[in-house]
Amino acid sequence: LPLLIYVDGKEYHDGIDISPGELYQRMRLNQMEVKTAAPTVGQYYQAFKNSIEGGAKEILCVTLSSKLSADYSSAKNAANLVKTENPESKIFVFDSRRAAVPQGLLTIEAAERLNAGQPMEDVLTYLENAWQKSSLIAALDTLEYLNRGGRIGQAAIYVGSTLRILPIV
């Protein structure tokens, strides 16, 4: 499911209503308020139910890091709701503990392994081992977007700008 992106209060679905390139370009050109939100429990619930009703025997959902987003929590709660109604359903929610490219690569590899016929248990073991070997380091050239996204306050911007400190995340 796509993340929800709010640009000046208007809702977009990541990669559907707005592309990353378009979002970044608009952010650079305008002083917009941009917020993100995880898909809701209800959205995950509906996606899981639709997949089961469509004949899925097993569902694997690889989420953004639970330390960065409510994505994992929403998916896990929805999976539990579906399992309560349909105890034989097999829904596996995996916290990638990653975001961006590392999460995407883990997800693609898991899908390829499942499509090649590997058992779900083996794919989950792979994911549990592989996430620890992946990382993403980003050097930021401005604190502006961290502030706009609500990650840091004005005091942090003042100190960072005054001392010319930029984070590596």
What are these regions (language model features)?
Residues 43-72, 79:
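N-terminal glycine-rich phosphate/adenylate-binding segment common to multiple enzyme folds
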